[in-house]
Amino acid sequence: MAKEKFDRSLPHVNVGTIGHVDHGKTTLTAALTRVCSEVFGSAIVEFDKIDSAPEEKARGITINTAHVEYNSTIRHYAHVDCPGHADYVKNMITGAAQMDGAILVCSAADGPMPQTREHILLSRQVGVPYIVVFLNKADLVDDAELLELVEMEVRDLLSTYDFPGDDTPIIIGSARMALEGKDDNEMGTTAVKKLVETLDSYIPEPVRAIDQPFLMPIEDVFSISGRGTVVTGRIERGIVRVQDPLEIVGLRDTTTTTCTGVEMFRKLLDEGRAGENCGVLLRGTKRDDVERGQVLVKPGSVKPHTKFTAEVYVLSKEEGGRHTPFFKGYRPQFYFRTTDVTGNCELPEGVEMVMPGDNIQMTVTLIKTIAMEDGLRFAIREGGRTVGAGVVAKIIE
């Protein structure tokens, strides 16, 4: 049993295990909960419970994910582990479980494998900011030179995808040993403790939504006689205060305006904060100057764009997606925040078609601008039906 109640005062950080099948991601996840329960008093979660993760639906896509939590001395960690490779792809692209940092599990006995590479690439594409490496199954490797070789390979692979390979912390150990409470050559519990300490020191505390620059996707626009124009929506991040200058970005040319009031539940407030549904009263903005799909932002914080590269997951037939592949020149709607915009898809060189259930990098050109940043999630739709999910990897123009 857990020794203490959930402590809200500790900063909260989201992490997850990534890496090739059978390299020990789930064993390490279970070992983390065990070691942290002994050292820091959080609850133990058994391997079998993590391995039989329940199905979840994120944007209509079926994903199996296990969520566990554990504490270090200074933080509370929420940790995701996926049983299958396809679940990782979907999870990372939809942002169902966003990670502030990832633990790359690589078997010291096998070295980097195809999914090791693919998960590092996915992490780069979807904007996972930090990776820490756990070289697992080190108890099965007698040769110190072999360990060094695998470590070098992993560092090279990280550098290939623009992670700081030379400076990435690599912990060598055995998750199975730690799970069994053993610690020969400090490869068991000591290594896992060291991993937790590394998470504490290497992954910076994420900037809370409320401390980021203000952004609210506009869902609806009203005109109130004698008061002016009100836009409503859920504030995604930051704070808006009365008299704040604001910009309206996307779909048309960017315009500037001023907040003259914030309303929630028909009450007037001095400010609106991240996570709240509210109406923002705008000075000098006409009802027809603004529409659903635009965003209200702190001036200069977000720019409108039309062309970007994306990492996309195409729904399978079973998930209600397309039954047939699509080809180059495919023109679906891209649903950003609150609206659909038509766009053209350019496939990578040598790729002729994309099958349902695939994940693919593509370059998209929209017919209208959208307020966009790297890491922004979107859905791909055909006539209102979701057929894919994606994330902006890199803005081009």
Swiss-Prot record:
InterPro entries, sorted: EF-Tu_GTP-bd, EF-Tu_GTPase, EFTu-like_2, EFTU_2, G_TR_CS, P-loop_NTPase, Small_GTP-bd, T_Tr_GTP-bd_dom
Any one GO molecular-function label of the UniProt entry: GTPase activity
Disulfide bonds: none
Ligand binding (GTP): 19-26, 81-85, 136-139
Residue numbers spanned by region G3: 81-84
Enzyme class: hydrolase
GO cellular component, one term: cytosol
Segments for region (G5): 174-176
Segments for region (G4): 136-139
Pfam families attached to this UniProt entry: GTP_EFTU, GTP_EFTU_D2, GTP_EFTU_D3
CDD domains in the cross-refs: EF_Tu, EFTU_II, EFTU_III
Localization of this protein: Cytoplasm
Amino acids binding Mg(2+): 26
EC number: 3.6.5.3
Residue ranges annotated for the tr-type G domain, each copy included: 10-207
Keyword Hydrolase: yes
Keywords carried by this UniProt record: Cytoplasm, Elongation factor, GTP-binding, Hydrolase, Magnesium, Metal-binding, Nucleotide-binding, Protein biosynthesis
Region named G2: 60-64
Function: GTP hydrolase that promotes the GTP-dependent binding of aminoacyl-tRNA to the A-site of ribosomes during protein biosynthesis.
Family: Belongs to the TRAFAC class translation factor GTPase superfamily. Classic translation factor GTPase family. EF-Tu/EF-1A subfamily.
Subunit structure: Monomer.
Entries under PANTHER family matching the protein: ELONGATION FACTOR TU, MITOCHONDRIAL, ELONGATION FACTOR TU-RELATED
Name of the protein this chain belongs to: Elongation factor Tu-A
Native organism: Pseudomonas putida (strain ATCC 47054 / DSM 6125 / CFBP 8728 / NCIMB 11950 / KT2440)
Organism taxonomic ancestry: Bacteria, Pseudomonadati, Pseudomonadota, Gammaproteobacteria, Pseudomonadales
